[in-house]
Amino acid sequence: MGERNLDGTVSVKATINKYGQKATRSVIKSSVAEDLHKSGRELGIYRESRRVAESAKAKAEVELCKAKKIVKELTLRIEESNRRLKSRRIDIEAVMNESRIDGNGGYVRIMRELEDMKQELSKLKLDVVYVSREKVVAEKEVMELESRMEENLKLLESLKLEVDVANEEHVLVEVAKIEALKECKEVEEQREKERKEVSESLHKRKKRIREMIREIERSKNFENELAETLLDIEMLETQLKLVKEMERKVQRNESMSRSKNRAFERGKDNLSVLKEVTEATEAKKAELASINAELFCLVNTMDTLRKEFDHAKKETAWLDKMIQKDDVMLERLNTKLLIAKDQLEAVSKAEERISYLADNLTTSFEKLKSDREAAKKEELKLREEARIINNEIQKTETGFDGKEKELLSKLDELEKAKHAESLALEKLETMVEKTMETREMESRRNSTITISRFEYEYLSGKACHAEETAEKKVEAAMAWVEALKASTKAIMIKTESLKRVSGKTMLEEERESFRMQRSLSIKRLVQDEIQKFKGNSEDNGLINSPKPVRKSVRLSGKFAPVQGGKSRRYSSGNRATPTFFVIKKKKKVPNMVKFFSRKRRNSSLEQ
């Protein structure tokens, strides 16, 4: 196993090599520096990955907010269209009621309302086109969001791989922790052995010091005895000097025999005393020589003992320093072990949070997939319904065109018939005036007026023909009214279909907004968990505070901001009106009134 724990800390074996086996410190420092560089690089890579993930999350949040705004605008527009449809429906119902009440007099209003309905239909078509465009844009945004979700899933996979790597590192760290504890126990045992050895050596040295002190005391006693013997030797030397002077006096006074004899006897006595004294002095000198030799040996032993004592002091000081260094190293190792424990706890908590977040993200992604499939199915259904509605609208438009053509042809026929009737009426009026004048002339002459059978039959046939034409005109008017009713019914059907489509689109948009809000809530939870993990890591002093990257750094390219479409407003003064139909309406309806009034006049004249 390597000699490195978390954060590049040197293991216990390295410390043993450092102090027990006399390993060099430069190698250990270089290995620690390399480990620190490696850990710094790994932290930089992890910070960059976190910054990239945070930037991607910020982008996704911004885009989700934009999509929400677009959905809100679309819902507002659909609500406005629904309100317009409701108001138009109420107006149509009011017009229908008025047409039922007014009868023929409400045709003009009905035609105007039909024009207004056509204008509203054109507006609704434009709104449908605009909504379809916005829907396409929203689908594109949904596709982009899906691509971003795939990118986020890739990031999740990379995070899972990092979590697996972290788990492996966690296992390695635990193994290193176990080995470090074993090494700590071994170091403590070695320290106890060293302490015992040092205590034994100190006890032995104390015993030696005591023996040396005793020998020093003995040497002091010997010195005192030597001093006393030296004093005795000096006394004896003075006595010898006196004896020598006495011998000189004896040699000078040889004249006196008695005195000589006495002195000789005394001299003999003194010589015997001197011999004894010289013998004693020689013995004392021998003792002094032996004592001096012993003193010299004692001095040498004292010097050796002093040297050993100084060496023992130095060794004890060195051992104290080593013990202090060992204590400092053990304290450092304990602090590093505590830091490693805290880091392991933080990593385990982070792994639990990341696993929880990964589970939440997987569940949310599965829900989004299911929602996406449901949305796709609903989109297919809505597209089919939109196709059916478009087909119905085209059919109704073709029916409108055919009915308009039929109405125009019938109106042309009515105009021709009116023109022919007007010519016939003019001829009849001229004929009537002429006959009236002739008959007045004849009545002045005679009281009776004679009419030929041909005239009678002609007049009766004309009356029948006029009745038939009047009936045809009434039938045409009734058909026209029925066509108007059918057109109003078709318009009502279209409005109901548009309401259904708008209601479905509103439901879809509400579902999409709910999904977006749910995804936003999930992403906010993820961001809160990441920020909590970030704060814990910053409190532990493991990770520096990364700068927020929210502008330029992007994962999958730059995303242009989606501009919210402005709602279109149509002014009532610029409404497009079909010119030919309005002109004919303005011209033909009064002609119909005139025609029916003339019909009534003719019927009154015939009566």
Swiss-Prot record:
Tissue: Ubiquitous but preferentially in chloroplast-containing tissues.
Its job: Required for the chloroplast avoidance response under high intensity blue light. This avoidance response consists in the relocation of chloroplasts on the anticlinal side of exposed cells. Acts in association with WEB1 to maintain the velocity of chloroplast photorelocation movement via cp-actin filaments regulation.
Subunit structure: Interacts with WEB1.
Family per record: Belongs to the WEB family.
Deletion consequences: Deficient chloroplast response.
GO biological process terms on file: chloroplast accumulation movement; chloroplast avoidance movement; response to blue light
Predominant place of localization: cytoplasm
Species name: Arabidopsis thaliana
Name of this protein: Protein PLASTID MOVEMENT IMPAIRED 2
A Gene Ontology term for the protein's cellular component: cytosol
Segments forming a coiled coil: 66-295, 329-445
